[in-house]
């Protein structure tokens, strides 16, 4: 298995650790700022701790990795034997992570191709896996970037949140959309579109919204070979129920991942998040 092309992503890809290890993928952590503490996602703050902080209405913000952190990562990967790096990151509409990676790539000891996938969570994770598999098959930088781009182009992400307040506070959704949702007391279904979070539908109750989310995901999956990821924050039972229902509805299902999002995404969605990523093969 070739490691000449190394894959770097960020902590919002939420890839299982064993999957990252198997494919040699490195994740650069984003930071959650809880009060006056800056904590690395994945190692210094858990999703559960984040959910508790949000429920207590503590001040929570997030920040990108610095260019210096990316530069150190690129050097370490090159020293481990990589002759080129594909660095795949969450949407630049949602974070400055891509910009930090671009700055660091200019000083890297080996060629680095930095890609704004326009994705987040396992929508980003599936892109990183596609790039890694292209490298393992003997492809170079161009092939790995193309594989990630192809996966991103076909991938969709949908999610339900209990309230739009967290997205509004973090500037990830327009104030007008958030105000409309709150004023009408509706439950929003959102989607990732062109790298931005957009309102897809407004439903009257949580149960109807989750049922509608299931319908949307099943329709998007179609009948061909497809991977699905179900994400949640502090809603494990709801995530398992959604996953089980999708298993019975999607004939071409290959892999189904169920996981809790990390603290960075959780900070902007709040507890009760249920989401699904649809990634055709």
What residue ranges belong to the model's regions?
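Short catalytic-loop micro-motif centered on adjacent basic/acidic residues
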Residues: 61, 87, 114, 229-230
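A general structural signal for short secondary-structure boundary/capping elements
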Residues: 52-57, 74, 133-134, 277
């Amino acid at each position: 298995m070739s490691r000449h092309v190394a894959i770097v992503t960020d902590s919002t890809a939420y890839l299982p650790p064993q999957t990252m290890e198997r494919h040699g993928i490195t994740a650069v952590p984003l930071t959650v700022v809880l009060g006056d503490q800056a904590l690395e996602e994945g190692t210094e703050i858990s999703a559960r701790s984040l959910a508790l902080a949000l429920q207590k209405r503590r001040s929570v913000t997030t920040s990108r990795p610095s260019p210096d952190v990316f530069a150190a990562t690129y050097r370490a990967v090159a020293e481990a034997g990589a002759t080129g790096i594909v660095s795949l990151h969450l949407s630049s509409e949602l974070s400055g992570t891509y910009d930090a990676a671009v700055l660091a790539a200019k000083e890297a000891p080996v060629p680095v191709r930095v890609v704004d996938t326009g994705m987040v969570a396992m929508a980003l994770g599936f892109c990183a896996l596609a790039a890694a598999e292209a490298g393992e098959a003997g492809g170079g930088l161009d092939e790995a970037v193309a594989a990630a781009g192809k996966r991103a182009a076909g991938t969709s992400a949908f999610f339900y949140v209990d309230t739009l307040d967290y997205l509004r506070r973090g500037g990830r959704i327009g104030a007008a959309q958030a105000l409309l949702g709150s004023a009408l007391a509706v439950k929003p279904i959102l989607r990732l579109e062109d790298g931005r979070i957009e309102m897809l539908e407004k439903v009257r109750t949580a149960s109807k919204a989750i049922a509608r989310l299931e319908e949307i995901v099943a329709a998007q999956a179609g009948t061909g070979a497809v991977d699905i990821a179900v994400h949640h924050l502090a809603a494990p039972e709801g995530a398992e129920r959604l996953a089980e229902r999708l298993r019975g509805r999607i004939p071409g299902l290959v892999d189904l991942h169920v996981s809790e999002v990390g603290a960075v995404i959780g900070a902007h969605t709040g507890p009760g998040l249920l989401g699904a990523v649809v990634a055709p093969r």
